[in-house]
């Protein structure tokens, strides 16, 4: 049980770090504009070694930002619940923190999946046609890796919960 929780906690911490780095950096997409190399993230775009804030209030950027932030927050809440699941308090016997942590990691996975899917769909269908020579970059890829890490953290914590439930069911009362 503790090995599952330890593996889940490791995946969750790495996933949360990747979520923060992915959301905060400016390399979601790279392209050439007027012969110059440019790149953009969720908050800024950079051309000719100068970066500018994204001042346009475009719905897909706002949705992607919101889902990535919600994902990071729910992952952090899952990490707190996951750390608390190592301690056993008699007053919390009916509330299983391993299960709560697993659910929070799945919620985080869902939010990052929504954010990445929105960004991917709009980028391929709209921005991809606007810029001929473009590609997704490392910040974007970190978002997908973070999704996998939070998903596996959820799997590990749900497995730990199931092992705990099996032990409870077989122990004499």
Name each region found by the language model:
Residues 1, 48-65, 127-143:
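Juxtamembrane membrane-interface segments at transmembrane-helix boundaries in membrane proteins
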Residues 1-29, 61-123, 143-146, 150-164:
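Signature of small four-pass
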Residues 22-65:
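A surface-exposed beta-alpha-beta supersecondary segment
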Residues 38, 99, 134:
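Short acidic-hydrophobic sequence patches enriched in Asp/Glu that either
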Residues 47, 52, 76, 165-167:
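Secreted/luminal cysteine- and crosslink-motif detector
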Residues 163-173:
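Intrinsically disordered cytoplasmic terminal tails of membrane proteins
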């Amino acid at each position: 049980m503790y090995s599952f929780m330890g593996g889940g906690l490791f995946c969750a911490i790495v996933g949360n770090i990747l979520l923060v780095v992915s959301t905060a950096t400016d390399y979601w997409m790279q392209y050439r504009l007027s012969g110059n190399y440019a790149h953009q993230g969720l908050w800024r775009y950079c051309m000719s070694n100068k970066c500018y804030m994204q001042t346009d209030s475009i719905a897909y950027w706002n949705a992607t930002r919101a889902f990535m932030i919600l994902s990071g927050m729910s992952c952090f809440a899952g990490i707190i619940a996951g750390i608390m699941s190592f301690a056993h308090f008699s007053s919390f016997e009916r509330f299983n923190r391993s299960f709560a942590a697993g659910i929070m990691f799945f919620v985080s996975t869902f939010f990052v999946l929504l954010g990445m899917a929105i960004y991917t769909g709009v980028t391929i269908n709209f921005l991809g046609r606007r810029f001929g020579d473009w590609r997704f970059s490392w910040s974007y890829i970190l978002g997908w890796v973070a999704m996998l890490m939070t998903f596996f953290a959820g799997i590990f914590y749900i497995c730990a919960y199931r092992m705990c439930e099996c032990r409870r069911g077989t122990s004499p009362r």
